[in-house]
């Protein structure tokens, strides 16, 4: 058998040659070693290319060797590698998601612990107010509403706290309630509640302030932000010269004794503009004109006095200069007398 016939058989049917070689090899094994081996088959794989088919070497009894290309191909390794890479990526993503969730849970726990350890504003305010005597401490009040969490406490904080010259502390709440604390009192027990009410009986522009009690001397003075009311004893009536004037941007208010229509313990305070009638305005204009004329007369007197002093100063200077002039004239005459005989010789 030549190489051309083997190659033609290989081109015709590779499968038939393989089956024949396998059957011949089986016959050699079962023939009790009486018949010599027909062919010796050895399989060798070519590693030149990735994924190339294996080559079978068939040795005939005559000593010829035939290269037969196998039909069965080796599995492609890239398929397994791609699947492995895919599984690794998915596992990494799952791990990152789990780690992110665990970190988020840890951060939320830490934040809750920090918030629970943080001191409340009421505690800070109570510590600050405990240093100053007479400042009322803010008490915590638990809210009874269903929607409010139990850890949240509500309190009524005054909008502003003022201290008078006598040492009293005045707290004005948002609802218009005024609380007065004496210097010797401690906490909320020394506070006096005042309620601002409006009435139609007083003239427009007036503000009514009602207070519960009075101090030992019977006089109370404090400032109310917004209306700027100055409250004093209800039995006293202030004259225009004793009008309570507030400093800064706070206007002046005059306190009048309560009328019969007002209840006991109510003081009416009105601004000066609302109390002026046309007659009072005319009197005020006359008073201002007289005051201006008086100031002009005083200024004219001062100007005349200064002019007289200036004239006297000038007269004294003229007298001094006249004396000096006379002395100079006498000296000049003496010099002339001394120099005249020398010129004659």
Swiss-Prot record:
Q: How is it modified after translation?
A: Isoform 9 is ubiquitinated by CDC34 and RAD6B in order to be degraded by the proteasome. Stimulated by phosphorylation. Phosphorylated on Ser-116 by TSSK4 in vitro.
User: What is this protein identified as?
Assistant: cAMP-responsive element modulator
Q: Where is it made, tissue-wise? A: Expressed in testes (round spermatids) (at protein level). Isoform 14 is the major activator form in testes.
Does Cytoplasm appear among the keywords? yes
Which CDD domains does this entry report, sorted A to Z? bZIP_CREB1
Chain spans, region Basic motif: 287-312
What does the UniProt keyword field contain? Answer: Activator, Biological rhythms, Cytoplasm, Developmental protein, Differentiation, DNA-binding, Nucleus, Phosphoprotein, Repressor, Spermatogenesis, Transcription, Transcription regulation, Ubl conjugation
Give the gene name. Answer: CREM
**Domain (bZIP) ranges:** 286-345
The processes (GO biological process) annotated in the record are: cell differentiation; glycosphingolipid metabolic process; negative regulation of transcription by RNA polymerase II; positive regulation of transcription by RNA polymerase II; regulation of DNA-templated transcription; regulation of transcription by RNA polymerase II; rhythmic process; signal transduction
Which residues are reported to carry the modification Phosphoserine?
102, 129, 271, 274, 277
Q: What ranges does the record give for the region Leucine-zipper, renumbered to this chain?
A: 314-335
């Amino acid at each position: 058998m030549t190489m051309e016939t083997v190659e033609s058989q290989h081109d015709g049917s590779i499968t038939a040659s393989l089956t024949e070689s396998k059957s011949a090899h089986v016959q050699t094994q079962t023939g009790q070693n009486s018949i010599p081996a027909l062919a010796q088959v050895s399989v060798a794989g070519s590693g030149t290319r990735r994924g190339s088919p294996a080559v079978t070497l068939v040795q005939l009894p005559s000593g010829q060797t035939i290269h037969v290309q196998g039909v069965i191909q080796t599995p492609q390794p890239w398929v397994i590698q791609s699947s492995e890479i895919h599984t690794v990526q998915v596992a990494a993503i799952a791990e990152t998601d789990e780690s992110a969730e665990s970190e988020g849970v840890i951060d939320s726990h830490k934040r809750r612990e920090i918030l629970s350890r943080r001191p409340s504003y009421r505690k800070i305010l109570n510590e600050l107010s405990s240093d100053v005597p007479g400042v009322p401490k803010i008490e915590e009040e638990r809210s009874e509403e269903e929607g409010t969490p139990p850890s949240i406490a509500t309190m009524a904080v005054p909008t502003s706290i003022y201290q008078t010259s006598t040492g009293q502390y005045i707290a004005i709440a948002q609802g218009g309630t005024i609380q007065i604390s004496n210097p010797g009192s401690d906490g909320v027990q020394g506070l006096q509640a005042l309620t601002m009410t409006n009435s139609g009986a007083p003239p427009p522009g007036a503000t009514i302030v009602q207070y519960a009690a009075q101090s030992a001397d019977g006089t109370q003075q404090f400032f109310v932000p917004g209306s700027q009311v100055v409250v004093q004893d209800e039995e006293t009536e202030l004259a225009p010269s004793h009008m309570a004037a507030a400093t800064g941007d706070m206007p002046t208010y005059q306190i009048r004794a309560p009328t019969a229509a007002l209840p006991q313990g109510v003081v009416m305070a009105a601004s000066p503009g609302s109390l002026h009638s046309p007659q009072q305005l005319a009197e005020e204009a006359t008073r201002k004109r007289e005051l201006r004329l008086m100031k002009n007369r005083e200024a004219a007197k001062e100007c005349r006095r200064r002019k007289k002093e200036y004239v006297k100063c000038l007269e004294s200077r003229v007298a001094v200069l006249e004396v000096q002039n006379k002395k100079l004239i006498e000296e000049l005459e003496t010099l002339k007398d001394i120099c005249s005989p020398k010129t004659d010789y």
